[in-house]
């Protein structure tokens, strides 16, 4: 009997994820016989689970908190995963388990869809210095952005991220945002500020250029106060749900051999599921 092709999400916890809904939508609409499951694996069991991933019946996996850094050490990472210091997508290349970080692709492709031509800019401002920030900074460097201001309330953390990259990444103190905003043609929030249950992100959108674009990685709520303020000014915006959908594309392609599309129907499906949140 032929085993159905399947992938999974490995996390701790992982039950809240919308990834199964996304991948099952693509499997159904593309007519592919396959599956996508959630595997709640504690940190102490992660190594053994990943090393025997195929034995568990999987041809690949997504990895979420708290396992992304550990996944890097247990696989053969590509340049993107190494640069970001974390892997979120695993797949088999023959007998070799490889890994990448699709947050970069998700961020870039979402911006391309929401603000075409955005990458013709010289300067960008990124808020936050966590793992998502590293993915965003790497993506901006890939697109040739000449100067990236990286702001964080703890300046040492911004400096640590800047030190990872041989590029013009400028650590910026939070209190100096007002001086940088007028030059930034792209503002990206990678912090949890503005997320449901978190304090609002207090940034004066009015200081941005009139042709700037604003991206927020938060997707609960879908329209954060930051994005609402940007839209009120007529700026191009990109929300966190778009990035979530676009980052899932590459994994599906690696596992099932077909590149899916992020459609309005898929977005509406996930939006409806997010609505109670």
Curated annotation (Swiss-Prot):
Residues of the signal peptide: none
Listed transmembrane segments: none
Functional pathway: Metabolic intermediate biosynthesis; chorismate biosynthesis; chorismate from D-erythrose 4-phosphate and phosphoenolpyruvate: step 4/7
Recorded GO MF terms: NADP binding; shikimate 3-dehydrogenase (NADP+) activity
GO terms for biological process, alphabetical: amino acid biosynthetic process; aromatic amino acid family biosynthetic process; chorismate biosynthetic process; shikimate metabolic process
UniProt GO cellular component terms: cytosol
Reactions catalysed according to its record: shikimate + NADP(+) = 3-dehydroshikimate + NADPH + H(+)
Active site: 68 (proton acceptor)
InterPro entries tied to this protein: Aminoacid_DH-like_N_sf, NAD(P)-bd_dom_sf, SDH_C, Shikimate_DH, Shikimate_DH-bd_N, Shikimate_DH_fam, Shikm_DH/Glu-tRNA_Rdtase
Source superkingdom: Bacteria
Sequence positions that bind shikimate: 17-19, 64, 88, 103, 219
UniProt-listed Pfam families: SDH_C, Shikimate_DH, Shikimate_dh_N
EC class of the enzyme, as a word: oxidoreductase
Keyword NADP applies: yes
E.C. numbers: 1.1.1.25
Keyword Lipid metabolism (UniProt): no
Role this protein plays: Involved in the biosynthesis of the chorismate, which leads to the biosynthesis of aromatic amino acids. Catalyzes the reversible NADPH linked reduction of 3-dehydroshikimate (DHSA) to yield shikimate (SA).
Subunit structure: Homodimer.
Annotated family: Belongs to the shikimate dehydrogenase family.
Database matches in NCBIfam families: aroE, PRK00258.1-4
Protein name: Shikimate dehydrogenase (NADP(+))
Organism for this UniProt entry: Rhodopseudomonas palustris (strain BisB18)
